[in-house]
């Protein structure tokens, strides 16, 4: 049992030549029914020292298994900053734009570059972390029916406006 857990994900990118870099970590603890609702980078909960350890563990793990492509290592963290490996997603996750906004790195482009057999176009020291990003998911649910999925026709859509705003939809 982990009291007050935090779900932290580390984004990595690796190539066939043994190069692996991290692109920071995301806080994914705000969930409902095991579905992420809010993702944030960097996590305001994780101390810098712990973040550095976690990022190093993620990169080393991927190097040891020879992983190449985009991937996400998921960890559970307790209130004392101890972290535990949960799983690795060997794909690009829905929340990857949070990482792109904080690094300026186009993860889709680089995933294609690596899949084509090319080396990563950057080294760890080339990646600059700047600012913070938050992703909020909107679910179509019926609050009067235990929040069951509620498909329907979208009749009005008003996009938010403002600086530094990215709007992705599917």
Residue spans for each PLM region:
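ATP-dependent carboxylate activation and anion-phosphoryl transfer catalytic cores
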Residues: 1-170
């Amino acid at each position: 049992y982990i009291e007050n857990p935090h779900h932290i994900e580390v984004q990595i990118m690796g190539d066939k030549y043994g190069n692996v870099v991290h692109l920071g970590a995301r806080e994914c603890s705000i969930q409902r029914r095991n579905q992420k609702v809010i993702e944030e980078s960097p996590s305001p909960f994780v101390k810098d020292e712990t973040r550095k350890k976690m990022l190093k563990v993620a990169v080393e793990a991927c190097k040891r298994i020879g992983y190449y492509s985009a991937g996400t290592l998921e960890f559970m963290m307790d209130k004392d900053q101890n972290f535990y490996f949960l799983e690795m997603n060997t794909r690009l996750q829905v929340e990857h734009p949070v990482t792109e906004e904080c690094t300026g790195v186009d993860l889709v482009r680089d995933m294609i570059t690596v899949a084509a057999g090319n080396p990563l176009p950057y080294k760890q020291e080339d990646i600059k972390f700047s600012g913070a990003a938050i992703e909020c998911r909107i679910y179509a649910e019926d609050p009067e029916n235990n929040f069951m999925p509620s498909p329907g026709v979208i009749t009005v859509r008003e996009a938010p406006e403002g600086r530094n705003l990215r709007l992705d939809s599917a």
